[in-house]
Swiss-Prot record:
Pfam families: Com_YlbF
Stored HAMAP family: UPF0342
Name recorded for this polypeptide: UPF0342 protein SZO_10960
Upper lineage: Bacteria, Bacillati, Bacillota, Bacilli, Lactobacillales
Organism: Streptococcus equi subsp. zooepidemicus (strain H70)
NCBIfam families recorded: PRK13676.1-1
Family named by the database record: Belongs to the UPF0342 family.
Superkingdom per UniProt: Bacteria
């Protein structure tokens, strides 16, 4: 029985990759990679995101300067159609992922009751 759960997880992983929303996000990511300006902006976004996660893990908040930098980056992303398309595709995909997470973790939530 325990092996079955891994088989189900692998089937679920393949099913997510087969979703039109996943394919759209993947295509959007490839378009970003092919565009130097969009790729550079994406890399900057990832770096800022990692820095924010590090701050959060240590209980720190971004400085006013960092907040201004984040706001400026957000505006650049919003003005870039490739990045906007990618993040919209990711948002559509995240609906499935959130639903799957809720379903998978329901038994653990039941244990806390």
């Amino acid at each position: 029985m325990s092996q079955d759960i891994y088989d189900y997880a692998n089937k679920l992983e393949r099913a997510v990759r087969a979703l039109p929303e996943y394919r759209k996000a993947l295509e959007a990511r490839e378009e970003i990679k092919a565009d130097e300006a969009a790729s550079q902006l994406f890399d900057e976004f990832v770096a800022v995101q990692e820095k924010l996660q590090g701050l959060m893990q240590t209980g720190q908040l971004p400085t006013e300067t960092e907040q201004a930098d984040i706001q400026a980056l957000s505006q650049k992303i919003e003005a870039n159609d490739l990045l906007k398309g990618y993040f919209n595709a990711q948002q559509a995909l995240s609906i499935y992922v959130n639903d799957i997470e809720r379903i998978v973790f329901a038994p653990l939530k039941d244990l806390a009751k």
